[in-house]
């Protein structure tokens, strides 16, 4: 699959911001008052969302634990029908746990409480770990998942758990929307990032850029053979709670997965974008600076 570079868009260059985030000091007093009310309401909603998610986490963990006990036949042998029902219950519990984790992560990002921990690590190992965790789900759906390790990537300081969360969200997105029989690729390459360019993927000679002997970033990409994303959604797809209109409701989600990706990558000091045409698959890429810059406040929207 080779997405069209001309349709690559980075939300970090679009001037996107979260609602109720910034207002000029020169704004009229009545507008400032409305802004403050809106911001307070937004903060209350975020707090309530986090509280509800946290309250659901414990009972759901208990239910999931009991389902695991039953599946292990520790309380007696199971017939085929019982195994099927318990399998459905386990899948439903997992989906709910993912929803709850998205809400909790989002609330942490909104309050600006997330902390980054940059430590020397092997990115190939981190990506391989994520692929191993996701491999069973891809196999269950009949999808091929390929990870292309790159020996040119040497250890560098990065926040491994959060990079893995970004990859997990991108793989989750690819798994949801790629039809059975499809293929998903994960790969990373050393990259020379020209920060003056608004479109990382539209460099005149991308292959030459990536082969330079002194890269300043790592480009990580997740590509799939799914239905793709029309250019009209390339910016909105990274918005909070946004979901692309679907003809069917076969896929579920919170609409936060890619928004969390955007927030994390922004906090790294990196850049994220999508390359896709409707009907021609999708490729999400993000850049991790090899030398971490001052971490950004992940609750803030990207600067214009």
Show which residues each predicted segment covers.
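Conserved catalytic submotifs in the C-terminal HATPase_c
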Residues: 83, 117-122, 139, 144-154, ...
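Short conserved segment of the HATPase_c
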Residues: 211, 215, 229-241
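Short alpha-helical segment of the dimerization/phosphotransfer core of two-component systems
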Residues: 91-96
